[in-house]
């Protein structure tokens, strides 16, 4: 089995902890789950790499580049969601660059499996603006595994982590097996990488570092991937 899969634990645990609610950090949850998913895939014979196995200063651009440099066949990014009003939303959602190809089938399978664990299945949505989906050359999926500000989602995450990891891994493996079977029957299945233009948007420029940090944190709360650079 030659399939190489890169598993990304969302955010980095240092400069970017992701969503934080009542002391609970998204970056800690994503690392636990990413390692569990990767372990299942490795035991099943897949070649697995990780963007991180601990807390490191790493940007989303570096995550995507790591996957590209390893010539991965698939990129799975594990995240958790957060609502503007704590506790107002719950469920799982998967994000893809566009709603085409095997990645859509895989995202739908992952969502359905997680629904079987107990999460509400929100949907699969196209998010071409996300760097880890836009800059990766291989099919990529970002899975939002419940809301970090929802008590029921957190209870599922904490008490059924192994089942959640198995549900994600099964969605990946079942789809890959289906693709392999279709390919052996002479049916086109694989998604070809496409070159995508990269656009950058600058929101603000400041002489005061704290002002830049404040704006960056506000944008992250709105769901944007941001980083601070010096001119």
What would you call each of these model-derived segments?
Residues 2-4, 14-16, 24-191:
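Active-site-proximal helix/loop segments of hydrolytic enzymes
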Residues 10:
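Extracellular repeat turn/loop positions enriched in glycine and acidic/polar residues, especially those
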Residues 183-231:
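Solvent-exposed beta-strand motifs enriched in subsets of small alpha/beta binding domains
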């Amino acid at each position: 089995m030659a399939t190489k899969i890169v598993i990304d634990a969302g955010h980095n645990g240092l400069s970017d902890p992701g969503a934080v609610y009542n002391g609970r950090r998204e970056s800690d949850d994503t690392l636990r789950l990413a390692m569990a998913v990767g372990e299942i895939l490795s035991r099943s014979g897949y070649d697995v790499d990780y963007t991180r196995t601990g807390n490191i200063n790493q940007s989303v651009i570096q995550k995507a580049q790591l996957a590209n440099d390893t010539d991965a066949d698939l990129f799975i990014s594990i995240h958790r969601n957060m609502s503007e009003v704590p506790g107002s939303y719950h469920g799982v959602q998967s994000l893809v660059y566009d709603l085409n190809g095997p990645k859509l089938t895989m995202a739908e399978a992952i969502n359905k499996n997680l629904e079987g664990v107990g999460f509400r299945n929100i949907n699969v949505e196209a998010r071409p603006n996300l760097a880890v989906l836009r800059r990766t050359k291989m099919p990529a999926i970002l899975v939002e595994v419940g809301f970090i500000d929802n008590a029921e989602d957190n209870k599922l995450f904490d008490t059924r982590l192994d089942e959640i990891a198995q549900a994600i891994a099964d969605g990946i493996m079942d789809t890959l097996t289906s693709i392999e079977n279709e390919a052996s029957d002479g049916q086109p299945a694989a998604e070809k990488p496409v070159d995508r233009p990269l656009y950058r948007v600058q929101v603000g420029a400041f002489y005061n570092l704290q002002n830049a940090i404040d704006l960056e944190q506000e944008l992250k709360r709105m769901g944007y991937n941001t980083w601070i650079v010096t001119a």
